[in-house]
Design a protein with these regions (language model features):
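Short beta-strand/loop element within the Bergerat-fold HATPase_c
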Residues: 48-60
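Acidic ATP/Mg2+-coordinating residue in the GHKL
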Residues: 68
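Short helix-loop "hinge" at the ATP-lid/N-box region of the Bergerat-fold HATPase_c
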Residues: 41-42
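Conserved glycine-rich
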Residues: 112-113
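Short conserved segment of the HATPase_c
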Residues: 73-86
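Short alpha-helical Gxxx[C/S/T] motif in the catalytic ATP-binding
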Residues: 99, 103
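Conserved catalytic submotifs in the C-terminal HATPase_c
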Residues: 7, 12-24
Length: 133
């Protein structure tokens, strides 16, 4: 449960009020995928950390970014993060490694992509793009 994790670790979530974005897709499955990415960021944030969300759109795609201020991904894990049942070197919790794979499948089924990378000043970032028809 995300709210339990937020309270337990005293994590803040920052989402700017940039207005609305629109895309063609399944809202419930998209929210499931976004929550999986947010959970990953929360689990890898230090107590008192911040998880950030940003979003924008252009004529080609809608873009959502979710990032944290944790240690980032182990570089050797990045190519495998979205593989089913893969648990990275810095894995926490008792997951079995399907959350990120599920998120990727959900976005790909909606003509989208999800990538993961380390931020220059520390932390990990997920970048989602859902393309227009």
């Amino acid at each position: 449960n995300l709210s339990d994790l937020l309270r337990k670790k005293h994590i803040s979530v920052e989402i700017p009020e940039n207005g609305c974005i629109e895309f063609s897709g399944d809202l419930e499955w998209t929210m499931e995928a976004l929550m999986n990415l947010m959970k990953n960021c929360m689990e890898h944030s230090q107590s008192g950390g911040i998880v950030h969300c940003g979003y924008s759109e252009n004529p080609l795609y809608v873009e959502v970014r979710i990032w944290d201020d944790g240690a980032g991904f182990d570089p050797e894990d990045i190519p495998h993060l979205f593989d089913r049942f893969y648990r990275g070197r810095r894995a926490v919790g008792n997951g079995i490694g399907i959350g990120l794979a599920l998120a990727r499948s959900i976005f790909e089924l909606q003509n989208g992509t999800v990538t993961a990378y380390n931020l220059r000043n520390g932390g990990a970032c997920f970048e989602i793009r859902i393309y227009s028809h």
